[in-house]
């Protein structure tokens, strides 16, 4: 479970649904009936906070000036998670859109991996005056991985702004060894 609190601004205002002071956490949870302790509840067994103490994220974050550099909903909009065979996690998010690589303790291992040529209005990589190529909140929504962990397949929630078919949802292939997109899409 990826936890992030969501808020919405007043009707008609721009909506950025991630709260700036809400730390992002990964939680390992189980249903109580699966644990043999009764039905109808979810029990959190373990959780870790996502953080960047090594400074891998190359742009300013909400807690830029703290030692732990906890990540919040203002930094990334996490939507998908793939557990890698080595115990690390790959996370798809919407703002960049980016794929993040984090250790099992929540520490960011590498710089966020941007999809080349694609930027949302919320992307920290969007230069002043640059036109976004992806509508807001249409970044990586779903993601899966190959059984051996070599490739990830993040899926854009929406079509690129210039795509004539706005129903199109593109699956991209990311090589986890090189941390580069292969150019293969579906």
Regions found by a protein language model. Give the residues of each.
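Sequence/structural signature of beta-propeller domains
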Residues: 1-186
């Amino acid at each position: 479970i990826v936890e992030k609190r969501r808020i919405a601004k007043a009707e008609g205002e721009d909506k950025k649904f991630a709260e700036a002071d809400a730390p992002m956490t990964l939680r390992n949870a189980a249903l109580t009936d699966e644990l043999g302790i009764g039905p109808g509840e979810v029990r959190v067994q373990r959780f870790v906070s996502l953080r960047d103490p090594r400074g891998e994220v190359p742009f300013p974050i909400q807690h830029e000036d703290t030692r732990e550099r906890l990540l919040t909903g203002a930094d990334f909009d996490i939507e998908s998670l793939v557990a890698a065979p080595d115990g690390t996690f790959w996370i798809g998010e919407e703002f960049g859109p980016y794929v993040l690589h984090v250790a099992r303790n929540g520490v960011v291992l590498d710089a966020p991996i941007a999809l080349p040529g694609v930027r949302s209005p919320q992307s920290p990589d969007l230069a002043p005056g640059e036109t976004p190529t992806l509508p807001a909140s249409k970044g990586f929504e779903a993601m899966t991985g190959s059984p051996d962990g070599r490739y990830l397949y993040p899926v854009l929630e929406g079509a690129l702004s210039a795509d004539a078919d706005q129903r199109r949802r593109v699956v991209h292939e990311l090589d986890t060894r090189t941390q580069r997109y292969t150019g293969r899409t579906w």
